[in-house]
């Protein structure tokens, strides 16, 4: 092999788009995939070209030595030889123009930005590419996401905010066509952990496990079935009737005044006592509503998959507190003792808790949930708004107090006859009303200096409130659009995964068809480890018939859909190093948060955790410098 020249041109064919650059350019970012590719000598078993048709190079005179089995290194990584082309993630060939051409089956548009990062040292995020795709490409090329320029960081981070919002508004997603799978996934989504054991050996236990998720979804998820929609409409009806009854109880037309005066013998005076009672019709209506709420509450707590979480839920606490006073009031109404009357008076005051039932509508209306999440996500903006208002109120209340004292009479030192602003705390109320542009008119300045302060206060209030409000509105728009998109998300189905080619097939391991041999991401040929590839296909398709391999548990078969779920379910993922140099791999395989494993068939080598065998035809490459890019290891997309 000849000495590598830094000014030698290299042609990178990425997804059919050819990019031409120098080896010195690729070496500007040590530790990345392209830097390792540029630092190594051309392997001997790569394909050469004759015209436009790729042909295998002549076989070596002696068979290459077999490399020992790969052993897991730190963090679950595999270290071993990296002499052949496929282990480097690309397919190389001699180009007639004199340069080396390497083929990578990756996204060509994103690679243009990656290559510009090598040229200019600045990594920008394309605006027309989805964030997870760009993140996946950065992970493949071994580039740290923190290298993204500040001008593009917000654009790059938008997909994670969207994923978090989609997690909040998660709706039922059915991933298969089998009704049994639908029930299992629904049970898993509703909190039933043992979704795979719905039909246990005990008949009674099996019936309970089948009934529990259905009843829970019936009262908790209005979109699970038609019966659930009917229950939701009934609950909505009783909530509105209960709130209407609560409001009508305060109207004079539904109040009955009764004389409760008790005659006293030998008394010198008579004290009249009157008591207001509610119309019995409203009491009966409220009783019917309470019976429904009691039935709903008991059913939900009995069939709840997690009793502790159910009890700690704020809406459930409100529901219980709104139900309990009615039964206590009915039980104590027949008692005439003073203690019972005091308790009844307290319970009548607690009746206002019934108005909080309006928050139960958040279960049935997406808009109310959007509003709640918007308020929660805009906490910083609300805090900033309160600070601005507090500063303005303090400043203008002080200014109006001293401005209105101008022109006070000498015989009126407190200026109580001259102005309504007798002290600064009273000015707080005026400043709040003025800054919020309400203007009740109960207090107003009367001097020219006070009018000037009032005008400045109104202008400052308009500017102060106008600054944080657009951020809150944008949050609401983002949450609402994502919630609507989540609801309209089509029914998911299992992806079609073609079967593995047989050894007798004419297309088995042909280089012209770009099979697993000499592919971009594959480290082994189908003929070398067909059993491993068959197992990987069965893992991706959810098939349990993988020979001697143990079946996967139901949580492992559930699709990875969200960034938070991917972080929780990550268990020592593997990555494959390109050289035998001392390289540090993170425990999570170097895959960053929010990065989902690729579903490509060319990326599944080693998914089962079996030992891979690489057969280099050249001596392993020894890097001149230690490759320790701990923040950005070079993972295979696994």
Curated annotation (Swiss-Prot):
Q: Compositional bias of type Pro residues: which residue ranges? A: 56-72
What are the entry keywords? Cell membrane, Cell projection, Chromosomal rearrangement, Disease variant, Epilepsy, Glycoprotein, Intellectual disability, Ion channel, Ion transport, Membrane, Metal-binding, Phosphoprotein, Postsynaptic cell membrane, Potassium, Potassium channel, Potassium transport, Synapse, Synaptosome, Transmembrane, Transmembrane helix, Transport, Voltage-gated channel, Zinc
Residues binding Zn(2+) are 124, 130, 151-152
Q: Where is this region: Disordered?
A: 38-93, 538-572
Q: What are the BP-aspect GO terms?
A: action potential; cellular response to ammonium ion; cellular response to nitric oxide; cellular response to toxic substance; globus pallidus development; membrane hyperpolarization; nitric oxide-cGMP-mediated signaling; optic nerve development
Domain text from the record? Answer: The transmembrane segment S4 functions as a voltage-sensor and is characterized by a series of positively charged amino acids at every third position. Channel opening and closing is effected by a conformation change that affects the position and orientation of the voltage-sensor paddle formed by S3 and S4 within the membrane. A transmembrane electric field that is positive inside would push the positively charged S4 segment outwards, thereby opening the pore, while a field that is negative inside would pull the S4 segment inwards and close the pore.
Please describe what this protein does.
Answer: Voltage-gated potassium channel that mediates transmembrane potassium transport in excitable membranes, primarily in the brain. Contributes to the regulation of the fast action potential repolarization and in sustained high-frequency firing in neurons of the central nervous system. Homotetramer channels mediate delayed-rectifier voltage-dependent potassium currents that activate rapidly at high-threshold voltages and inactivate slowly. Forms tetrameric channels through which potassium ions pass in accordance with their electrochemical gradient.
| Oligomeric form and interacting partners | Homotetramer and heterotetramer with other channel-forming alpha subunits, such as KCNC1. Interacts with KCNC1. Homotetramer or heterotetramer channel activity is regulated by association with modulating ancillary subunits such as KCNE1, KCNE2 and KCNE3, creating a functionally diverse range of channel complexes. Interacts with KCNE1, KCNE2 and KCNE3.
The entry's protein name is Voltage-gated potassium channel KCNC2
